[in-house]
Every structure is written in structure tokens, then in C-alpha cells.
């Protein structure tokens, strides 16, 4: 039997009492159970899920207990009423039941008399489940946790809002301050009127202002957030790279548009009209010449029109720019450019030839006068395509610099750059080779009367400059006093152009055009330089201070007119030395070439031209040298690439010396070697003269029994004979005609250009053979030494001669002793070696001149009057030598006579012996010794010639290097102690030493440091106290002194663009700093004026200063002033510009057009060509040209050869720069004005200038 569940009675009683006291529901109810069907009234108390019932509400113990957990309480219907009276007398009852989940437990039935009370009990019992309470508790806990999270979030948001409010309050305060300030400035009148209105109106306006500020703040916050986003991207490296890349593309579009326009002018203004002219009845030009001049020009124009349209299409899709496919289109067409490049030199030659036709020249001038050409010549337009490919290369360099490595166009752009660089190297060589032709044609166009001799494409331009020409009467006046007034100087000023064959003397017209003077075209073969350096000290005592040591005379003896003398005066010693050196070298080259082409020894069939032609190293490319197809002034192919050793060999080759090669070498040797190497080479040539001539040429020179033609074969044909329109010509040398070759006799290397001191001073007599029997000139006498000399035969070199090092001897006299020792050795051995054959004489050491035979001892110099002597200078009738076809006088004999006339060492017997060598039948050994003598003299003259050019034109090399200066002086002193030295050679060496040791006075040329020192202690005066003329003059003086101080070696290697630019190019950086200082100074001077009228007056005055600078040819100052006025800080001052006069604005536009960078500064270049020095050009123009050359081609080829074509182009630019540097202004420094121009006390930087401009004229609200 199941036991009953035991309960703790005490605990139940306690709960019952608690239910009686704190129960949820209490009251009397009637209950009925299954055990007792009668209704019993009990007092019930509900405590949680326990239902207690008591007998009465005062019973101490409960009668029973029901556990309500899991039960169901609900209303029950009333039972059917009985018919008994007892039931009918009862009141209506309300029933409800409690059903338990356990089926064994019976339902509890309860009733109450009140329906409301019944519903409340049902509801209370229904809620008395612990499970329901636990569920509600869980739900409440979830709500509680959620509310806690919400509270925390709200706290964070509240904190952020409070921070934003604080920031907003600060910003509001700042904006209120700004708004207040703005309103005070702009709305002062309106604020005052609003203050007079009523309080109601004030309240409305304040509300409107608040709303406006609120709206402004909301918009400002949005804009600020968006601005931050934009600024973050703008400052990113990617955005910066893309921005620079876009700028490169936009610049490329502008340059391409300009280039297409240039090609359009070339085709429409020249090509097509000339085609029509060639089809006329009397054509001024043939169709073949038109095709040769304009080969592929029209095709190139069409190609670039397509390229330009494609580039515009790419720009229209900005910011997405895809360019690689454009260059892919261009690359297959490069063969068209290559044909144009190869034809470029030929086209200019054909053009120069056609311009000799007056009808064509007149027609061409009409075409060039069209407005579209803008005063540019046809040669200029033909050169534009040569610069386009290098411009593409620079653009591709910049694009690749700003293109990421992972960019899709990177590989394509790299490939395009490599292909264009290959063509660019060819183009640079062509431009270098044709520059001389274009220069000659440009000068010819500047001469109003024309100058046909400049249309000779074989002429080489050497130098130009402004010299003063004096007549003989003015010369005599100048020796008694000053030269004269400024007007007299201006009238005597001449613009001189030196070419390899002619000297052109012109005057400058008002429009910049040149006019030939009387006898202004001088053939150099008729000239003799009459400068006498040895008499300078005596002349200086009587000459005026203005022309002291600065004048030089040129004696001219034309063949078809009377002789005359030209007296020219340079502005400085250095300029005079440069002019005389170049004139001497040009005269020497042209005379010696003339002598070379004529007969001197009929007994020999070997000639110097044949000797040059037989030397394949002069025209055939080799591993260490490559040639162009252009010839230099000595009719030898120009060097394109060469090793350093081959360049030094060309410098010391005794057979010729081209003036253009010498100038280029001396300008650029620092790039590939140093001064000590050059000096060692010259010393070695002096000590070993035979090493200056190639062995094969020596063999030919000393060979008299072999036919050179049979030995070496025919020379190649002329390059022009096989020239085609679009193919490069073969490398070849022109030949002489058979009849001329038959007349040629044995010549010597000195006659081909190496003799620069004696033969350079030869004069050409206007008479012919009548001069042969003329007496000696009475102007000077020559004393001839009658000392005896021993005849010696040629022997191989002794070991002492072979191993002589090319260094300066430590002891005085060692050099001359070494040379004398070789002669003594030969003299002693000659008696035992009389039977040596000619084959043993291929290399001979320098020996002394052989003695004169006794049969000539009693003859006098008057029997040989073929040469004249004038003041100690030999005056030979070289034209008679050139024109005489039957002359039997050898070049060796002629040279011997010439040198003997100027030398006090050899006797007259030696002179007569040398003249008769050609006809007296002496042995070959004696003839070879005669040639050795000439070669030795040629070597000495070559060394002195190069040193003279080096010292006179490049003095800074010796001023900055004391060791080099000391070595040269020691070497020259040793040369002067040589007993075999001729008088003219000794004088030349003495002049070089005097030039090295002479300290130039700087009284007439104020240096920049001295000018700055003059301003110390000077009080700065305001701008209004200085006239515009004084400012312009002093600014020009400062600009010229800064520009003049730049040494030309700084122009090599782009040092101004390197990281160490201040160390490598300090003077170029100083010039740049000065330019920026003046530009900032002018802008600051304009901005500092608070009054509008004062600012307008300052602008007008500075424009007037710029115009005066233009008249002074100071184009650098013009650009300084115009660039400062065009700054944004000044250009935006619209109210100020309204006060500026129209005339000033028109003048400013004219000046800006003059110095504009359009077309590579074409207007500025034209002005520089049409002006006479002194002049200050814009340095940036030349630096741009140099960068263009440096970027286009390297200094060395892949084989390690020096790019000499590049050096030649850079040398030509430096030559133009030095032309402007050497001519100085005659302006006296004024310390007050200079102190004002150098004052930096009130200067502002770019940012401060713009801020001051905004204060003057604030930006208008948008």
C-alpha cells in the first residue's frame, strides 16, 4: 500500500497564517468536492500558488491546502434549478472550477454570490502559477538588459553630441566674429539704419540672421566634410603623379598643335607654290630640286595631322588618358622621318644652290614675306622636323616618370622611347652637320644687298662680333689723343663675320638689317694680318687710352684692284686676341690649301693631296673613329665619334688644322679628358715631330721612286656625284683633275694647314711675275747668320730620341739640349752612313738644317727677290705660286726661304741651297733631310699655334690652374732656349708667355663684387627718386656683370639640374637667383603701394624701364619685368589695371611678345640676330637648348667613343654666349640706384605677395 506524503505541519501552519495576513485574494467561498456533495462555506486565502481554506477568517490553523501549480481555473455554468422550495429560496450563485492536471485528483468546485467576485477569484487563481511568474521574470530581465544597452549607447551619443556642440559653439563663435567683421565692412549703413528701427523689427532681423547663420553653418559643415575627402586625395602621391602626367599631356597637345601649324605653312606657303612655279614656262626651279628640298614634307604633315587629331580625341576623354596606341601608330612611320633626316643636308645644299638664281631668290623672299611665316625663313621650317623626335623623347621621359610601373601603358611607352631614341641620335648628327649651312644662309638673309659668297656651302662660319673700324686719318688722330666723341664711335662700329674663306664687314641699319661696307667682302687669301705684337710696348706710349693694345690691321691685296688696309679695334684684349688668332688660322688654312694644290717639285709624282687621300684613317670608319659626310674648312671629313686618342691625333696632325675643330676641341676637352693630357700631347709632338704624321703618310712623303696611284689606288669619288634624294651619301673625298695632278709636285705637311705663324703672315702681292725682280722692301732689314752647318743624311731614330718622355724638364736647357743632342748624333754618324737607302728613312728624328754648298757662298739675297720683307714680316706672293703652272720651286724650298727670312740663325747660304734643291740634282738623302727640317718646323709651329689659341681664348683654364700655367710657361721658356728656333717662333712663344703673365686691368670693366662694395654705407632712396633711365641702365649693368661672370665650362653636363648644382654650376645658379630677386623686387615694389594711383604709376614706370632695357638690348631685364608684372598677385588687381593707360598696356603686350617662349623663343632669337653687342640675352633660352642636346644624345657611344658631333653643337651655343659676354657696356655705376635695386628689406615671397593682393582687392563672393 502506498504511503501518504508527509508534510511539515508547522511549516504549513506558518504559510497559512502568512496567507491569512498577506494573501493575494481572501474571502468566503462555498466549495464542494466529490467526497462531499454538499456545499460548505469556508474562508479561502490565496498565497502565490497555494490556496488555503479555514473554517473562518479567525481560525488559527488552516483546514486544508490546495497546490494550484499546473491547474486550470475557469467559470462554470450554473446547475439547473430544482423545484424544491429550499432551492428556490436560495439566491443566484456563480460557479467556477479548478481542474488539476493529474487525472486522479478530482475537480474542485467553488461558488460565490457576486459575479464580480467570481471573476476576480478566477483571474487570481489563473495567475497563481510559478511558471508564469518565471516566464514574466525572464522577459523582464531581457528587457532590463536591453534597456541597459540602450542607456549606454545613449550616453555615448550624448557625449559625442556634447563634443560636437562644443565644437559647434567654438566654430559659431569664430563664424560670428567673421560675420560681424564682414557685416561691419560691407553693411555698415544698413546696420546703422536697422538700429533706428523698432524693437519688433530688431527681433525679426535678428531671427532672420540666426536662421541665415544656421543655414550657412549647415552648408559649411557639408562642404567641409566633402573638402576633407577631396583634400585627402589631392595630397595623395597618386593624385600628384596623375596631375603631373596630365600637365605633360596638355603641354604635348599645345606643342603638337604648333608643330602641325609649322608643317602646314611649310607645305602650303612653300612646297605647293614652288611646284606650281616649276611647271611654269620659265621655271625658276626644277621639279627634281623641289622634290629634293621638300622630300617627305607633305607626308610628314599628313602623319602629324592624324596624330594631332588622335591626341585631341584622347584629351576629350579626360581624365582617362591612353596614349600608347598613338605612339604605336607613329612608330611604323619612322622610316619616313629617317629619309627626311638623311636628305636634310642635301636639301639645304640644293636650296643654297637654287638661291644663286635671282628669280628663285626673289620668289622665295615673296613667300617668306607672308604673314603666316612671321619673318621665318624656309631653312627654319625645314629644320623643325629635326627637333620633333627629340621633343617626343623628352615627353616620353616625363610621362614614364609619372606613370606607375604597373600601369598598362608602361611597356608600350618604354618601347616607343627606345625606338625614337635610335632615330634621335641620327637626327642630332644631321642637325650638327647642317648647322653651318643654316648659319651661312641666315647671315646672307640679314644682308640687304645679299652676299653670294655665303651661298658657298663649303664655307665654315668661325665667329662674329662688333668691332670699330678706323681709317688711316683716324688712326693718326688717335695716336695724338682720344679717339673722339660717342657719335664718332657709333659711326665706326661694324658688325664683322669671319668665315673660313672670307671676312664680311657690315653696318647695322635702323631696322636691324645689315649693309655691306665699301670693300666689305674680303677674301682671306688676299689678306695679311699686320699686327706687330713685339712693338706694342712702344706704341702704347703714344696711343690713346681707348685703343691701347686693341687695334689690328689687315692688309688686303686683291688681284683685280688696288691694295688697301683695314684697321679694326676690339673692345678688350681678349677679344682682339680671339679675332687675330682665328683670322691667322683661316688665312693659313686657305693659303696652304692653295699651295698644296699646285706644283712645287716636278721631279716627284707624289703630292700631299694624294698623301691625304691615301690615308684611309681620314675618311674610313674604324673601331675608334667614325666620320660624318660633311667636310670641314680643310676639306677633310668631320669627326662624328672618336676616341680621345684619335681626337688628340687630329689636333696635332701636321697636314691640316681645321679652325672649327680646334675651337670645338678647346671648348669641350674637359668632358672627355683634362688639360694635362692635352699639354703632354703637345710637348710630345714638339719633341718627336715625326709622330705627328701617320707612318703610311711618312712613307709616301719620303718616297720619290714609287707612283702613289699605283701604290695606294684611286681615291673615292665625290659624295655629291652619287647623292640620291633619300639615301645617305658614301664617305668619300673629292679628287683633283688629271691635268692639275700632273702639275703637282712634292708638297709637305706644313703646307696643308699646320704652318700658322710664318705662312699665316704671308701677304699676297697684286703683281705677278714682275715682282720676281723687284728689290727688297725698304721697310725692314733682315740679318742672316753666316754660321757654318754640316750636311747630314737622314738616319733612324736613336734610343735617346725614342724614349723621351713628354714632361717638362726639371733643369733649364734640358729640352733644347735633348733636341740638339739628336742633331749632333746624326752629324757624327753621317760620314759613316752615306749609303743608306730611302727605305731606311721612313721615320727620322728632327735634325738641324743641312749646310749650304760652297758654290752658293758668294750669292746675295737680291738674286732671289721672289719674297718680300716688310717690318720683319715675310710678304710672299703666294698667288704667283698658285697660278704658276711651270714653277719648279719646291714647297720645301719656299718654306726654307720664308723661315730663313725671319730667322737670324741659318745663313744665306742655307737659303740658296734650299731654293736650288729641286734643280741641282742632290741625292735623295739630302732631300729627305730638307723635308725633315720642314716637318720639325711645322711641329713647332703647330704646338705654338694650339697654345696661342688656348691661352688667348681660354684664359680661365690657366687662371684657375696654377700647375697648368706653370708647366706651360716652363715649356715655352725651354722652347725659347732652343738654338734652332726661328725668330718668328721665338716671338710667338714670347707673346704667349706675355699673355699668360699679363694681368688684365679691370678699370674699364667693373666687376660685380666691386660694384656691390660701392653701395656699402649708401642710404636706400625710394622708387620715386630714381628716373626710369637710370634704373634701366644700372639694371642692365648688373645683369651683364652677372651674365658675364659665368664660365663656359658650366654649360656642359646639365650641372644646373643636378642635386649638387650649387657646387657644379655656382655662377649659373647665381644668375638664376639674381633673375628671381629682380622679379620679386619689382612685384614687391608695386604691391607695397596702398594707393591705386600709385600702383598704376609704378606699373607704368616699370614698363617704361623694360622698354629702355629693350633699347639697351637687355632682353633678360625685359623678361624679368614682364614676368613680375604677370604674376597672379598683380595681374588680378583689376581696379589698378583700369588706371593704367592704354599706351602702357599696348607696350607691355609688345614686350611680352618679344620675350615669349613660343616657337623656342623665335622672336627673341630674331632680335638677337638683328642687334649689335653689347647685349644681355635670356640665359634660360640657351639652357633649354643645351638640355635639348644633352637629353637627346649621350656624351659617349656604346663603344666608349666621344660624341664629337654633340660637342660641336654645344660649342656653337657657347660661342654665341661668349660673343655677348665679351662685349661690355659703357655704363658708369651709380651706387644709389644699385643699392636700391639690391635692397631686400621690403621684398615679399610669393605667398605674402598674394595675401597682400587679397587685402588690396578681396575676392568677390561667388
From Swiss-Prot:
Keywords: Guanine-nucleotide releasing factor, Phosphoprotein, Repeat, Ubl conjugation
A biological-process GO annotation: small GTPase-mediated signal transduction
Listed Basic and acidic residues bias regions: 821-839
Domain N-terminal Ras-GEF: 635-749
Alphabetized InterPro entries for the sequence: DBL_dom_sf (IPR035899), DH_dom (IPR000219), GDS_CDC24_CS (IPR001331), PH-like_dom_sf (IPR011993), PH_domain (IPR001849), Ras-like_GEF (IPR008937), Ras-like_Gua-exchang_fac_N (IPR000651), Ras_G-nucl-exch_fac_CS (IPR019804)
Role according to the record: Promotes the exchange of Ras-bound GDP by GTP.
Subunit structure, as described in the record: Homooligomer and heterooligomer with RASGRF2. Interacts with USP8, thereby regulating its stability.
UniProt remark on domains: The DH (DBL-homology) domain mediates interaction with RASGRF2.
Protein name stated in the entry: Ras-specific guanine nucleotide-releasing factor 1
Organism, scientific name: Mus musculus
